[in-house]
Structure formats: C-alpha cells, structure tokens
Amino acid sequence: MADRTPLLRINDLRVGFDLPEGRLVAVDGVSFQIQRGATVALVGESGSGKSVISQTIMGLLPRSAKVFGGSVLFADPNKPGTITDIVRLSPNGAEMRSLRGGRISIIFQEPMTSLSPLHTIGNQIREAKGMKLKLLLD
C-alpha cells in the first residue's frame, strides 16, 4: 500500500507584520496540502499572500514578518515516518539549510526572470538538479 501522507501540509497558517500601528495580517488561516509527485501553483491577486506563504515554506521570511499561528509540515521522503514543522526550524539552522534548495524549492512570481522561454520547464529543472548534484559531488 502506498504512503498517502502528504509531502507538505500547511495547517491554519497565520503570518503577519508587526507595525507601529498594529499587526498587518498577510496570511490568515490558510490550509492546503501537497501530495508526493504533485506540482502546485499558488495563484491569486496581488497582495493575496502568495509570496508570504512561499517565503514561510522556504524559511525565508523577512525579519519584520512573524508566524503567529499554524504549521508547515514536511514529510521528507528520504526520512520515512519523519515529519518536520518548518515553522519551528531556525531559518539559518543546518536543518533548514539542508531542506532549502535540496528538498524544497520554489519559483517565485516572476517566471519570465526565473525561467527561459526557449526551454521546457522540465529541462530547466533537470539542469538545476544536475548542477546541484555536481556541486555536492565536487
């Protein structure tokens, strides 16, 4: 029987920015999950929280941002049975750095500056993975 544990599960995520006038809520109670092998696109209006959600998943929130609720649970296929709450990791800690780029990656909002229109997305991803593998082996 195949493992049906979601690869990534976002539960009631709440992220905001504490300002002198009070808290500006950027993400308010967002929940979704991503199954193994799935490709997901976060789509929404400008200012809807897509980038903040992505930055939270990657552990790349700016210092002015704060996760004040929820969880981002990652079930690493390389560590069966282990679920890591990314929100609880130190953004600059060894565990987060090992996940970022190697296990979890994101293409941000401006695909024309991130991707080449002359090559398929699949080829570009394969090339990036090959370059990372080469760096690891060197």
Residue ranges and their predicted role:
Residues 1-138:
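ABC transporter nucleotide-binding domains
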